[in-house]
Amino acid sequence: MLHEAETWVAVAFVLMVALFIYFGAHRMIGEALDRRSARIRKELDDARQLKEEAQKLVAEYRSRRESAEREAQEIVAAAQADAERIAQEAKAKMEDFVARRTKAAESKIAQAETQAVADVRAAAAEAAAAAAANVLSQTVKGSIADNLIEKSIRELGGKLN
């Protein structure tokens, strides 16, 4: 049995384990495993904390985005309302402008009609006065005729104008 290799491997193994125990290798291995376990636990805690912070940031950014979208919608709605109000004001101003221009045109037309009527009356009065002067000058002779014609022309001109 002493000549077999397996025996010597077993003896060497037992001696080596005894030496490890004697020098405290099991404590060092346990402490190393404990340190590694603690480091892994810390890394997991850090990762969990980072994940929570990331989730908070994501929620905050979503909230900000939604707020910005609402604000943008409010701005668009306000702009549409302003545009509609401006269009209505422009339409009202245009209608007022057209009404004033129409009234001014009607006033000018009425003035032109009045002027035309006055011009026609004046022309008719002049024609009537000339005709009356012509008739009187042919029928009445002398200084009486001249005085009568002048008087009639003055009276006729005053009455027709």
UniProtKB/Swiss-Prot annotation:
* Annotated GO MF terms: proton-transporting ATP synthase activity, rotational mechanism; proton-transporting ATPase activity, rotational mechanism
Family matches, as Pfam families: ATP-synt_B (PF00430)
Spans through the membrane = 5-25
Q: List the subcellular locations.
A: Cell inner membrane
Give the bilayer topology. Single-pass membrane protein
Regarding protein family, the annotation reads: Belongs to the ATPase B chain family.
Q: Which HAMAP family match?
A: ATP_synth_b_bprime
Subunit structure and binding partners? F-type ATPases have 2 components, F(1) - the catalytic core - and F(0) - the membrane proton channel. F(1) has five subunits: alpha(3), beta(3), gamma(1), delta(1), epsilon(1). F(0) has three main subunits: a(1), b(2) and c(10-14). The alpha and beta chains form an alternating ring which encloses part of the gamma chain. F(1) is attached to F(0) by a central stalk formed by the gamma and epsilon chains, while a peripheral stalk is formed by the delta and b chains.
Q: What does this protein do?
A: F(1)F(0) ATP synthase produces ATP from ADP in the presence of a proton or sodium gradient. F-type ATPases consist of two structural domains, F(1) containing the extramembraneous catalytic core and F(0) containing the membrane proton channel, linked together by a central stalk and a peripheral stalk. During catalysis, ATP synthesis in the catalytic domain of F(1) is coupled via a rotary mechanism of the central stalk subunits to proton translocation. Component of the F(0) channel, it forms part of the peripheral stalk, linking F(1) to F(0).
State the name under which the record lists this protein: ATP synthase subunit b 1
